[in-house]
């Protein structure tokens, strides 16, 4: 997900997306631990998406203050 797409979301939608990505990251880590993970690049993509969302949320919080 690109930063442009994330910025178009509302704060509630961003929080929901972050929650979804965290759940996916949790599942991917389990798959990696058991040797079932085929697409290891997905781990870093999900982590980066979480970071993008957190960054944009903090930018919005600073804007409002």
Curated annotation (Swiss-Prot):
Keywords: Ribonucleoprotein, Ribosomal protein. One of its GO terms (cellular component) is cytosolic large ribosomal subunit. GO terms for molecular function: structural constituent of ribosome. It holds the Pfam family Ribosomal_L29. InterPro entries: Ribosomal_protein_uL29 (IPR050063), Ribosomal_uL29 (IPR001854), Ribosomal_uL29_CS (IPR018254), Ribosomal_uL29_sf (IPR036049). CDD domains: Ribosomal_L29_HIP. One of its GO terms (biological process) is translation. PANTHER family: 60S RIBOSOMAL PROTEIN L35/50S RIBOSOMAL PROTEIN L29 (PTHR10916), LARGE RIBOSOMAL SUBUNIT PROTEIN UL29C (PTHR10916:SF0). Belongs to the universal ribosomal protein uL29 family. This is Large ribosomal subunit protein uL29. It comes from Lactobacillus helveticus (strain DPC 4571). The gene is rpmC.
